[in-house]
Amino acid sequence: MTLPAPGAALPDDGYVAYLKAECPTCQLVAPLLGELGATVVVQDEPGAFDGAIDDTALALSFAADVEAVPTLVRRAGGAEVGRTFGWSRADWRRLTGRHTLGADLPELRAGCGSKTREPNVYEHLVARFGAPGFSSRAIAVGDWDDPVEACFDRGWTDGLPVVPPTDARILRMLDGTARRPGEVIGRMPPDLAPLTVEKVAINAVMAGCRPEYMPVLLAAIEAALKPVFTLHGVICTTCFSSPVIIVNGPIARRIGMNSGINALGQGNRANATIGRALNLIIRNVGGGRPGELDRSTIGGPGKYTFCFAENEADPRWQPLAEARGIAAGRSAVTLFQGDGIQGFIDWKSRTPQDLSRSLAMSLLAVGHPKLCEFFNAVLVLSPEHHAIFADAGWDRARIEASLRDNLRRPGRDLVAGAHGVGEGMPADRGDAMVDKFWPEGLLVVRAGGAAGLYSAICCGWTGGRFREESQPVTIEIAE
């Protein structure tokens, strides 16, 4: 249906009333409309009011920006000169100049919401009848074409189907942030293309995000674009790496992120789609496509999505974001340059000392047992493993210090050629005691289900060897 020209079905002079049959206040004022000679526009059941204009397509109500019914509009010379909504005897008398109008009606009666403002409706009306105002180029899809296949054909997907980014869906996604659609967040590597909030929303739609995920996604993007995150290198490396998003704070619970059972796996919409949206933006805006500027030799599943929330349920545990300088109780994201998951199983350690030594044995294998101060890593402690530490009174600082001590080894065992293995540290480190990670290079996170003595290790990118140039990034989420 095409939107009628403003006022095309309406009188140049007189009154227009916008009603819903299901609204009791509309039924209350209906007898007055004949007295006023008003043109009646009905959003739901035109037959409920004699001579009413059928506006079930909501074109007239949208054009008049009706937010509540009944709305009474006074027109003169083809233009609106006044309006009121709901029923207020004083307001209706003031608008009409009829000082005895509605004398037998209650003084006040609240109206009802306009159908134009029902969930998901307004965005569709803007897309259909209005001007969305997007700067991105519109792509027309034929009536007989499959829009999902059209996205595949244009190379917009990560290999899985995406949600077609219609105008209504994009508008709805933009409702998830107060930031202007045209705001440029930064230049997305590797092509360094300008990334606007609008383009973020488009890719968030395709990834399957809900609007309330936008603050997390925008913060993750801002963290990834910090120079010290070296996103260009992470995208273009021959290594396995991709951005890993770790979310802390109230927003993770509010949007339903998973920090418990299967936290690093499938099945949670927020976890899956926030990480996927970032990777789609890298691909669709930045040009980071496999075989082009993405040169990963083997790749990794994190190139689809790798996003989870930290389990903050145990008050004995200091959340990662707080440990990295964010005020307690605030929401934040940490971006890490990570590979896949290396499983850690220890069913038998019962003391924090034993468990620390056991964890260190697995952490030594990150990247290569003889490469040190070369990778960062994330250690995801399951609640049962964390409880072994916490029940003994160990806090984050003590856990990290013990791991650091257990990860320090003689350089003679690590230099190239030692133990018949060519890989290793430079010969000049042979007389030193060498740490596996930089002091700030091991991020310890608590996540996972309540049952199971299983934790996980996520190896970092090889760029971590450049300590000052490539680091994880934590920023607060603007809510």
Residue ranges and their predicted role:
Residues 104-129:
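Long, low-complexity intrinsically disordered regions
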Residues 9-33, 39:
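Short active-site neighborhood of thiol/selenol oxidoreductases, capturing the structured segment around
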Residues 18-22, 42-46, 382-384:
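Structural motif
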Residues 37-58:
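Thiol-based oxidoreductase modules, predominantly thioredoxin-like and allied folds used
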Residues 4, 13, 36-37, 72, ...:
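Catalytic cores of nucleotide-enabled group-transfer and carboxylate-activating enzymes in metabolic
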Residues 67-68, 73-111:
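Non-catalytic, surface beta->alpha helical segment in thiol-disulfide oxidoreductase systems
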Residues 126-479:
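Non-transmembrane, aqueous-exposed alpha-helical and coiled segments at domain scale
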Residues 1-13, 99, 103-112:
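N-terminal leader/targeting and pre-domain segments
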